Amino acid sequence: MARVKRGVQARRRHKKILTLAKGYYNARRKVFRVAKQAVIKAQQYAYIGRKQKKRNFRSLWITRINAAARINGLSYSRFMNGLLKAGITLDRKVLADIAVHDAAGFAALAEKAKGALAA
């Protein structure tokens, strides 16, 4: 059986990790063993961050909707309940965008929500 030398594969594997570690400081960029740990940790943080991003944006949208709703005399929960009763199905992302960029449009939505709550 022929002897298998793995120099090419090892170099390729090392190069892949060291390429991912570009921009890191000191040994985290230069030493394979340290760079591998740094890259694994960075990928873990990136994975967690992608999940947290969804939570953070949802809470930001809710905060913006709440602020705009209170300007129009409603709490967030009553505003959302009013929209539900009025049959208006806009998601929080769109509502937050309307609240920031179109105050008059949001005021009209708030009036519809108030009307649906009163009825």
Curated annotation (Swiss-Prot):
InterPro entries: Ribosomal_bL20 (IPR005813), RIBOSOMAL_L20_CS (IPR049946), Ribosomal_protein_bL20_C (IPR035566)
Keywords, alphabetical: Ribonucleoprotein, Ribosomal protein, RNA-binding, rRNA-binding
GO biological process terms, semicolon-separated: ribosomal large subunit assembly; translation
Gene Ontology molecular function, alphabetical: rRNA binding; structural constituent of ribosome
Stored Gene3D superfamilies: 6.10.160.10, Ribosomal protein L20
A Gene Ontology cellular-component term: ribonucleoprotein complex
Domain of life from the UniProt record: Bacteria
Pfam families, sorted: Ribosomal_L20
PROSITE patterns: RIBOSOMAL_L20
Family in the record: Belongs to the bacterial ribosomal protein bL20 family.
Purpose of the protein: Binds directly to 23S ribosomal RNA and is necessary for the in vitro assembly process of the 50S ribosomal subunit. It is not involved in the protein synthesizing functions of that subunit.
PANTHER family associated with the record: 39S RIBOSOMAL PROTEIN L20
Protein name as catalogued: Large ribosomal subunit protein bL20
